[in-house]
Every structure is written in C-alpha cells, then in structure tokens.
C-alpha cells in the first residue's frame, strides 16, 4: 500500500451508511468504484492483514486516496456506482465495452411506407422493430422481407425521382408504388401484414392471406389468388425454420461461462416466443474477480447503459444465481420506471433456451482461449527469434495503397497479445506528394503517426513496414527523429515480399542494423507477421478504394460548369448514384431540386459527350 495513504486515519472518518466509494492512484486516476450497504464495514475489509484475493492485494497496493459519497439507500448506491463506472472506466472494475447502438428495422410513416435499416437516434417518424443483435441480422431480415412482402426499401429521394419502375419491380420484390403500379389500398394491406410479421405474428399473417386467397378465387381472380398462394407458402417455409416457444412473451435469456479470466455472456433475444437474434459479450474482467461481481456488473451496465437504444423486456433469465440479484432487480426497475425481473430457476421452454445460451457461451470461451493461446505462442516465438528481453505488448504495421498514384492511402493496424486491436486502427489520406511515390507516402504516414509522441503515449514495441529496404530506411529515419527525446523507441522490421510474392518466402529486415533474415514457411512467428501484414494491406486497400470512388464521383460531376458540392449531392441522392445520373434523360434530371432545364441539358451533354 502507498505510504501516502493512512488507512487507519481514513477509516475513522467513514460512515456506516450506504454509499459509493472511489479509489484513486498516485496519478489521481480512479482505479476502482464500489458500493456498500455499510461503507465502514466494506472499506475496512480491504485493509485486513493476509488478504487472500490477489486482485484485492494489487488494488490496495495502488491506493493513494479514497472518496466516499453517501446515498439514501442501497438501490441509490447501485445506480450511482454504475454511473461512476461508466464515467471513469476504472482498471480494476469489470467493464462492458459495448456502447454501439443497436440496429432496427424502420417502417416509415409515409403515403407509401418503406422498410429500412436504422441505427442511431430514432428521429424519423414511423415504427421501429427490434433491436436486432447486429447489422447482419437486419440486412438478412430485410432481404427476407423483400421476398415476402413487395414493399419498397428505397429512400424517399430515390422514390420521388422515379418515372419508371426499377429493377426490384422486375424481380417482384417491390410493387412500384412510386409509379402507380399498385393501388394505395393494396399497398397498405401489404404494409399491415409486414408489420404483423415483424411483430412475430406469423400465423395471423398467414390466416389473413388464406382468407384473401379464397376470396380472390371466389371472384375468379386466379392470378391474384396465385400470388397470395405463393406468399403463404413462402411464409410457412420461414415459420417452420424458426424455433418457437409456447410462451409468447418477450425476454432476454443469458448464458454465462467464466474461465481462465475470460467471461462470455451469450444473450438470446426472445420476442413473441421466437429467437429474434443472439449475441455474445466479453466484458473486460480484472484477474481474480469473483463470479458474483462479474454477474452484477454485467447486468447493471448492460441494462442501464443509456447510450444503447434497446427495447428492454420485463423478464431476464440468467444461468447463475448471485447474492445481490433482488437488489439489482429493484435498482433496474427504479431506473427504468418499469417492472424488471431476473429469474434463474426455470423450466420447460425457458430451460431449453437457457441450455442453448449456456452452450453457446461455453463454446465461445473455449474458442477464445484456444485462439488466445495460439496468438500467445506466436508472440513468444517471435520474442525468442528477435532475442527481446521484455514481452511484446503492442505491434503496428504500415502499408501504402494506390492505383497508379491515385487516391493514396496509408494504413496503420495494431495487434496486441490477443490479436487485432481494431479500435486502434488508423488510415491516413496522403496529400502533397508526387503520385506513385511510395517513399514519400510512407514518410508522411509515419510522421503523422508519431507526431508529438510522448513517453506516456501508445508506443509500439515492434513496427512492421510492408516494403523493402528503401521504405524501411525512410521509416527508421522518421522514428529516430521523433523518438530522440524518449528512452524507448519501437524496433522497426521491414517485410519484403519473396520471389513471386509467394507467402512463406518473405525477407525480414531489421531497421537499426539492416540485417536480413528469413523464417521457415511453417514458423508460427512468421504466421503472426503475415497476419499483421495482410491485415494492414486489407485495411489500406479498402480505404484506397473508398477514397478513389468518392474522388471519381466528385470529379466527374464537379468538372461540369455550375455543379458544386450541393448540386452534386442532390443529383447522386435523387437518382441513386453516378451511373444513374449518367443514364438519366434531360426530363429526369430536371426533376432534381436545383436543376434547371438549361443545367439539365448541360449535364446531359457533358456526361454523354
């Protein structure tokens, strides 16, 4: 424990009331936040002799001072604890790093409503269905909806600009309300059915369609009856593929597995008795954290995270019981102002769902441990080959991508001992160089990466340069200049392509000595280097292609007299893209806001000329 902190003196001032405590280190950073029904009793437990828990020993050794906030009740303490954890992200707390908003399907409020992918604030009027566990689940659902219900999925600007049906009409995936190919009544009927389907009321939709099919057959409208028949068959096929519970309510089912420092919470989102989607969460868990704290922290942070727009069910089923379960129920209910119950001992359908969630959580942890061990072994071998005295904690790799010097982009990807650390990836748009000059591009990228680098900054142990000796020398020179005032600098290694660019034949070059060496093609250390090199290449080329496409779209239209950024944006949005603008007639161009007949003729002539 720090000599500057007098535990006995501090404990004499602590109240026995409920409240929250914040522990700080010598840098005045919050390292742990906790709550207690009796603050004096709880805080005293940290300073007993012979602490058994290794995590607690490490925590106490870093305490410089402690702040205490009293609360009216234990429920208030729970809520305040969650707020502080989210604010400070303390290193010794269990942290759920998942602030991404959840995706939804939007059924817009419009004369002819559209189905659309939506993520973020729900500003547009309409009905939002979800949440879905990820974007892929939404896109898959929208693709399915196109086959089942001929409702438009285009944006309103594209819808307004149509003078003839688009390809989706030809594929029977849209009824083309934009050009009057369907009556408003028939379109509204399909919208109602789609809404019921998204609410999980499959059988109600099928029953309604059966009635319509029989009515059409009685009227001898056999073509219409056949369309309803095909729609019914498609819906029945989908319904058969979905696992359905007799319980038609909404609930989240959480399977938990915690092993070797890795915790996985696998959630099944059950809506209207069906598995609406699933998702695994891996909170950051400090070593030696007990299971009760992991469970409590996850539930509290997951269901009280205001940054995540989520429809929270009244019932949560979880695989493990824990000490403060009822206090958590009360805290979440109070915070959300709605009934919220947590169940652990369940039977029938709930038990079946829970077994599935636990199996998924267990498999996920086993897979992660296997991957972690593999990556760890590769790091250890690389350390041995490079004869390093300290473990590698962070590696970075630079690559350059362009097409004949056009739209040059540099990438910097980051690996830690668990593999790719994608939140740290960076791209650099390269400007002001001779097109195609890879040396100048590398110089600019590395300079920007380490500009104003300080001792406390994120300094890689190894910096790979995807290229030969020339690019490596450029990067080494920049690093020498930028790190001259620091005690630590990264070890640079060039990764030169082998004969015929075949994997396994790479030549590695040390930046400081320019010594070259190769590794066996089956070396796990080489596989690690290839992985970071390939990831850097992928990230660079993706950024380059996006930039190139944007540049070409911009330059093609803005080279036309009178077309600036606003008109270019209006043209692309209304007509759906550059190719559609090129293929548009003068009459279609005039329909775009801000485009006169003279301007439309100018655009038409310029793009067709």
Curated annotation (Swiss-Prot):
Task: Tell me the GO molecular function terms.
Answer: DNA binding; excinuclease ABC activity
SMART domains per UniProt: GIYc, HhH1
Tell me one GO biological process term.
nucleotide-excision repair
PROSITE patterns for this protein: GIY_YIG, UVR, UVRC
Q: Which UniProt keywords apply?
A: Cytoplasm, DNA damage, DNA excision, DNA repair, Excision nuclease, SOS response
Where does this polypeptide localize? Cytoplasm
Question: What does UniProt give as GO cellular component?
Answer: cytoplasm; excinuclease repair complex
Q: What top-level branch of life does the organism fall under?
A: Bacteria
Pfam families, A to Z? GIY-YIG, HHH_5, UVR, UvrC_RNaseH, UvrC_RNaseH_dom
GIY-YIG domain: residues covered: 16-94
Domain named UVR is located at: 203-238
* Family membership: Belongs to the UvrC family.
The job of this chain, per UniProt, is described as: The UvrABC repair system catalyzes the recognition and processing of DNA lesions. UvrC both incises the 5' and 3' sides of the lesion. The N-terminal half is responsible for the 3' incision and the C-terminal half is responsible for the 5' incision.
Q: How does it assemble?
A: Interacts with UvrB in an incision complex.
Name listed for the protein in its UniProt record: UvrABC system protein C
Q: Which organism is it from?
A: Shewanella baltica (strain OS185)
């Amino acid at each position: 424990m720090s000599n500057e902190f007098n535990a006995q003196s501090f404990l004499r001032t602590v109240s026995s009331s409920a409240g929250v405590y914040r522990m700080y280190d010598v840098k005045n950073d919050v390292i742990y936040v906790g709550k207690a029904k009796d603050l004096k009793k709880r805080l005293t437990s940290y300073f007993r002799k012979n602490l058994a828990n290794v995590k607690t020993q490490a925590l106490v050794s870093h305490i410089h001072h402690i702040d205490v906030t009293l609360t009216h009740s234990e429920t208030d303490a729970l809520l305040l604890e969650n707020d502080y954890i989210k604010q400070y992200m303390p290193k010794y707390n269990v942290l759920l790093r998942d602030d991404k908003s959840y995706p939804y399907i939007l059924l817009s409020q419009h004369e002819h409503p559209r189905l659309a992918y939506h993520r973020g604030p729900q500003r547009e009027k309409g009905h939002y269905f979800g949440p879905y566990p990820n974007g892929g689940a939404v896109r898959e659902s929208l693709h399915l909806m196109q086959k089942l219900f001929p409702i438009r999925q285009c944006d309103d600007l594209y819808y307004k600009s149509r003078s003839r049906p688009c390809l989706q009409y030809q594929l029977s995936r849209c009824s083309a309300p934009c050009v009057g190919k369907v009556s408003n009544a028939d379109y509204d009927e399909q919208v109602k059915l789609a809404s019921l389907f998204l609410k999980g009321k499959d059988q109600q939709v099928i029953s309604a369609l059966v009635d319509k099919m029989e009515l059409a057959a009685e009227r001898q409208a056999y073509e219409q009856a056949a369309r309803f028949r095909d729609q019914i068959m498609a819906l029945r096929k989908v319904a058969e593929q979905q696992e359905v519970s007799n319980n038609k309510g909404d609930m989240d089912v959480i399977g938990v597995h915690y092993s070797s420092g890795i915790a996985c919470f696998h959630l099944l989102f059950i809506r209207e008795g069906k598995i609406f989607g699933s998702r695994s969460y891996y909170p950051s868990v400090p070593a030696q954290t007990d299971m009760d704290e992991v469970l409590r922290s996850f539930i509290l942070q997951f269901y009280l995270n205001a940054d995540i727009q989520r429809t929270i069910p009244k019932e949560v089923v979880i695989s493990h019981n824990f000490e403060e379960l009822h206090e958590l129920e009360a805290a979440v209910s109070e915070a959300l102002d709605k009934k919220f119950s947590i169940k652990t001992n369940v039977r029938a359908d709930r038990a079946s769902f829970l077994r599935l969630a636990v199996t998924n959580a267990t498999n996920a942890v086993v897979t992660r441990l296997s991957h972690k061990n593999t990556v760890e072994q590769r790091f250890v071998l690389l350390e041995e080959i490079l004869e390093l005295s300290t473990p590698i904690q962070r590696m970075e790799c630079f690559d350059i991508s362009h097409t004949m010097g056009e739209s040059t982009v540099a990438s910097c990807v980051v690996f830690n001992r668990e593999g790719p650390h994608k939140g740290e990836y960076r791209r650099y748009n390269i400007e002001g160089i001779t097109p195609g000059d890879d040396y100048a591009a590398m110089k600019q990228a590395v300079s920007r990466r380490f500009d104003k680098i300080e001792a406390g900054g994120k300094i890689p142990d190894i910096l790979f340069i995807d290229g030969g000796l020339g690019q490596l020398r450029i990067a080494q020179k920049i690093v020498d200049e930028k790190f001259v005032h620091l005690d630590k600098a990264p070890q640079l290694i060039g990764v030169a392509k082998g004969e015929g660019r075949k994997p396994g034949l790479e030549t590695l070059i040390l930046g400081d000595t320019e010594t070259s060496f190769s590794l066996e093609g089956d070396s796990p250390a080489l596989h690690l280097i290839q992985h970071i090199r390939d990831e850097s290449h992928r990230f660079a080329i993706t950024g380059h292609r996006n930039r190139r496409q944007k540049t070409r779209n911009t330059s093609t239209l803005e080279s036309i007299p009178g077309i600036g950024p606003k008109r270019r944006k209006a043209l692309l949005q209304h007509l759906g893209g550059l190719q559609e603008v090129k293929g548009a007639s003068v009459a279609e161009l005039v329909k775009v806001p801000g485009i006169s007949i003279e301007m439309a003729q100018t655009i038409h002539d310029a793009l067709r000329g």
